[in-house]
Amino acid sequence: MSMPLLKLAVVGCNSAAGLLETLSELKLPLAAFYPLDRDDEGELVSFGGDDWPVLELADFDWKTADVAIFLAHTDAIADALAAGCKVVDASGGEPQRGAVPVPPVTDVLLARLLGAFKAAGDVQFAVGTGLLAVSQEGQAGIDKLSEQTRAIFAQQAVEVGTTYAKRIAFNVVPVAQEKAAASATKLAKKLGVPLSLQLAHVPVFYGHSLSITARFGAPVTADALTTAFTDTGGIYLLPSGTASSQDAIGGDQVWVSNLAVSDDGLSASAWAVVDNSKLTALLTLAALQAALEAR
């Protein structure tokens, strides 16, 4: 679909600066661009090869924009919808009626992997552990890892702050189990596969990783599993070696390696990595297209 020229507002342009940069690379057709944030009015952000001053969110007239992308959750979503804006919600907050949501990268990652396992055999249940890069939390996560790392090397006191429950530099911080369980329950219902999920924040700037194991109702072969993963859209099965989160940076596919089947053929496991920022940008673009097509 070719897009019309957009009068585009982006909310949370400072809190999600990394994602904004990736969105800029998609070269959206713009008639006007309005970078908005609750703070930092007057600061400059780069988008589409130009520098733009950040506008105060509270003072913005939503009738001047025809589409809005929310990278940060705010009650202004309701104001944008009321003014007739097409709204794409990439904030990860509670779904808003009338807004087109952007699915979380972890959900898309798990859906692709479970889809491949289901193509190989009758999946009874699956168990996964996801390792989340700090860019999951936007610029706040990137800044916190940078600050804490510098403080440790300088032998200074490390400020934990509010972004993570514990120090993130040189550490692994589990996500609250209630949040992980809620995500697993929602996905299990959607995909028809019981799922147990653990999530943790790791001191990596970009690139999510996931280890997943599936249990089958009948034995599967290594060949069948390889074929299923090779044929599943959005997955790149590494022919040999191991994929690291750095390998996936800049791409939109889920890289899979370490694909293994148990001796009895009743369980199989895989290691997967994905560029969370790039994939989120592409999912946001797809949501934007859906919003423009909606009446």
Feature-to-residue mapping (PLM):
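Flexible, small-/acidic-enriched active-site or ligand-binding loops
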Residues: 276-282, 286-292
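Glycine-rich phosphate/pyrophosphate-binding beta-alpha loops
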Residues: 201-203, 274-278
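A generic structural signal for beta-strand entry/edge sites
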Residues: 209, 265-267
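Hydrophobic side chains in beta-strands
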Residues: 130, 174, 214, 258-259, ...
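A structural motif
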Residues: 128, 212-213, 284
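N-terminal Rossmann-like NAD(P) cofactor-binding subdomain of oxidoreductases
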Residues: 2-166, 192-194, 218, 222, ...
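Contiguous C-terminal substrate-recognition/catalytic subdomains in enzyme active sites
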Residues: 61, 159-249
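Short, well-ordered beta-strand elements
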Residues: 268-274
